[in-house]
Amino acid sequence: MNSNTDLHHSDDQDFSEFLNEYYLQSNSQSIEPEASYEDGEMEAEWLVSAGYPELTKPFEQGLEVSKKDLEPILTTLSKPHAEAIVQLVRTLNKTVRVRTKSRPKRKPDIRDVFREFDEQGTVTRSRSATPDSLDSLQIDEAWTNNSLPTFVNVYEKNTETAIQCVEQSNEIYLKQNLRRTPSAPPKSGTYADIFRGSQVRCDIPLYSADGVELLGYSRIGTIQFPRNRSVSDPFCSIGRSKESRSENDARSQKKKSSEVLSASENECGRLLPMPYNVLSFESICRDSSSLDSCEVLDTCDIPSTLFTDVVLISETDMKRLQTILWLELATIFDRNKVSLDKRKPFKRRRKEEGNLFGVSINALIRRDQQVTGTDSSLVPLFLEKLIGELLRRGSREEGLLRIGGHKQKTELLYNELESTFYQNPDNLDNLFRTATVHELSSLLKRWLRELPQPLLTNELIQLFYQCHTLPSIDQMNALSILCHLLPPENRNTLRSLLSFFNIIINLKDINKMNVHNVATIMAPSMFPPRYIHPSDNNSIAEQVRMAAQCCRLTNILILRGEKLFQVPNNLIVESQKTMMGKKGWHRHRNSNEITAKPSGKASNVGVGHDSTVINKYSTNLKHLHPFVI
């Protein structure tokens, strides 16, 4: 019982810590408006990101992509990546076909509807489309006739008789032969208001016709439509029907009451002895499947020659590599049947009014370069110094990141940094020395919380979250690919934070902060609720599941650490092969086989020469940014 009580207490404490950070995130900024993609737009965006915008042009014109245009591109790709391209193109073509079928058809012409009737007629008709052209009588003969049509005469004489005919429901009405008249001006009388518009240009119907029978009529304003009455109205049939239905339902419920009660008792008896079979925040967070896979991969001796650090790849090669990374990510998601839910960027930019807090990472780095006059490490200067101070004084502090600082002192420090950081950056060290480590950790979480865009970017954060549906190995590969796709400043900032978290975790015996504690505290900052939120905000189960998955993903990101930023060399070689394929890869390869090349030079890069690729990036360090913790 004591172990169960401790587990309950730990579960409640962890979830309450997450909720505290979650509410701080929710109260700071409202939920971002989501701009949804139209059908096919997301697939077109993926093709553009993968470097194949030419495949989206037929879709923009409402046409399907032909095999003739697709085959030359597929020959330059590996089989999994080619299948990913084919799947995206197939979706675009399907969208085009659906749009073509859903287009509104032309309204049918009235002359087409009565074409057979017109062909069978023997009387020459007028070419006009007026009702007079449909009359079977000649115009002169109709107007020279002194007597009114049969219907008019009968109606004037037998108005009361016709009203009685309406009340007699079982009476059989006489049928007469079909007879149509031109639009004669009706006589003034009591019948003028029977048919609305009869004084304009409307044919007067007869009592009977071939296939048409006049059953009755009502004066305008005499027809009463039923009104919706309240259930308490004694004249309301709706209420009586509802009561009868409720009585029937009550009888059926009485018959099933014993079965329901017995089933509920069995269910409660099954769940009460095992309270942890229900949805639990702690059980999802501590799901050991992915965490065990991380530990297995960490213990395996994977040769470092198979990977290249992302900071060693030049900017030009990184742009070329991103096309393959998008295809590799699409392959992983398609293989596991997970939707490529790439978030559509919000066009209207948020106004950045702050000086240090509430400012994008890119803007902070530009300001740092203006102040220091040197190349930046693509990590904000404020964050570098803040992490350095926390590591120097607080790495062994118990409850670091969990315990909050003094609220009033933290607010004073926040205002001082916001107003004087870039005006007097040398004073930063003095401000940090006067603050406690818990106040500094509160500033770190607040800085992440007030970023105008999430650290994982608005475009990729939904893909990061969807990785929780992938199996363990694919999940870690997808997370690594997404880290490579981040902008350089976001990627380096994330790397700096993960390194800081791992240093804290390595001292968990002293500071009492293990990986689960750190992930629970930092998950709302990594996955802000204004971007990642359940579809049903009123469902407690959905909220708990979402919170637990965010903590679990943050846990995996921390455990993987530096391994997230290692690029497989086979992807680097494939990116070169793809680029060469667009420019004549086969011709270039044949010329390299004929021409003798000196050995040991980094410029001679071919397919399958992984060591040569590593030498190339190892010798070119001009683009290398210093990485500071």
UniProtKB/Swiss-Prot annotation:
The keyword Membrane applies. Pfam families: RhoGAP. The record marks 402 as: Arginine finger. Residues 237-261 are annotated as: Disordered. One of its GO terms (biological process) is signal transduction. Keywords: Cell junction, Cell membrane, Cytoplasm, GTPase activation, Membrane. SMART domains: RhoGAP (SM00324). It is found in: Cytoplasm; Cell membrane; Cytoplasm, Cell cortex; Cell junction. The keyword Cytoplasm applies. Residues 240-258 have a biased composition (Basic and acidic residues). CDD domains: RhoGAP_ARHGAP18. Residues 359-565 form the Rho-GAP domain. Disruption phenotype: RNAi-mediated knockdown does not affect epithelial integrity or apoptosis. Residues 185-294 are annotated as: Required for interaction with Moe. Changing residue 402 to A: Required for activity. Inhibits negative regulation of Rho1 but has no effect on the positive regulation of Rac1. GO terms for cellular component: anchoring junction; apical cortex; cytoplasm; plasma membrane. GO terms for molecular function: GTPase activator activity. Gene3D superfamilies: Rho GTPase activation protein (1.10.555.10). It is a peripheral membrane protein. Its main location: cytoplasm. GTPase-activating protein (GAP) for Rho1; functions with the ERM protein Moe to regulate Rho1 and control proliferation in the developing epithelium. Recruited by Moe to the cell cortex where it negatively regulates Rho1 activity. Can also promote cell proliferation independently of its GAP activity, perhaps by acting with Arf6 to positively regulate Rac1. Interacts with Moe (via FERM domain). This is Rho GTPase-activating protein conundrum. The lineage of its organism: Eukaryota, Metazoa, Ecdysozoa, Arthropoda, Hexapoda. The gene is conu.
